[in-house]
Regions:
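N-terminal secretory signal peptides that target proteins for export/translocation
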Residues: 1-4
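Bacterial N-terminal signal peptides
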Residues: 7-18
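Boundary at the C-terminal end of the N-terminal hydrophobic targeting segment
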Residues: 20-23, 27-29
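Central antiparallel beta-sheet cores of small beta-barrel/beta-sandwich binding domains
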Residues: 29-33, 38-163
Length: 163
């Protein structure tokens, strides 16, 4: 009798857990679809800082024009991007890991190499509504980055430094 009850409890628990997991998978697929659609055709227009460098008077603009953003496999996403900061002005595919903190996506690079951008790159960048923010490290240099997510046609109005 006890074995029968334990077996029944296990079957019920397995059914509940599998339906919750299936629901989580559906919700995650919806979040990923929304993330890809929100960033494809968007422009990240913002500012970055360099630790140890006074930026009160010197605003360091950055601009990432995202042609497309697609999940590839195993948590990796490819951002087809035109990148502009400092003397960088390149268009290239950037494949990076994206992890999720609940419903919030975050690019999570750790001591990585990105073709066209260099090596020893680390970044943790979250995307929340119409904003992005995070930290970055490139070799000995690092800092913060933050800005707005705009549609490509709207963002051509003013560079980040003319606010």
């Amino acid at each position: 009798m006890l074995a029968s009850r334990c077996c029944m409890l296990f079957v019920c628990a397995a059914t509940v857990v599998s339906s919750v997991v299936a629901g989580d998978d559906v919700a995650q697929a919806q979040r990923e679809k929304k993330f890809g659609e929100a960033l494809s055709g968007a422009v990240l227009v913002g500012t970055f800082s360099i630790d140890g460098v006074k930026t009160d008077k010197l605003r360091l603009p950055e601009r990432y024009e995202l042609k497309s953003v697609k999940k590839t496999k195993d948590g990796l996403w490819t951002f087809m991007a035109h990148v502009t900061y400092f003397k960088q002005d390149v268009t290239l595919p950037i494949t990076v890991p994206v992890v999720w903190a609940g419903d919030t996506p975050m690019v999570s690079l750790s001591n990585s190499t990105l073709p066209g951008l260099g090596n020893q790159l680390s970044a943790k960048v979250i995307f929340d509504g119409g904003r992005y923010a995070g930290t970055w490290q490139h070799g000995k240099f690092g800092g913060h980055l933050w800005g707005k997510i705009e549609r490509a046609d709207v963002s051509k109005s003013k560079p980040a430094t003319e606010k």
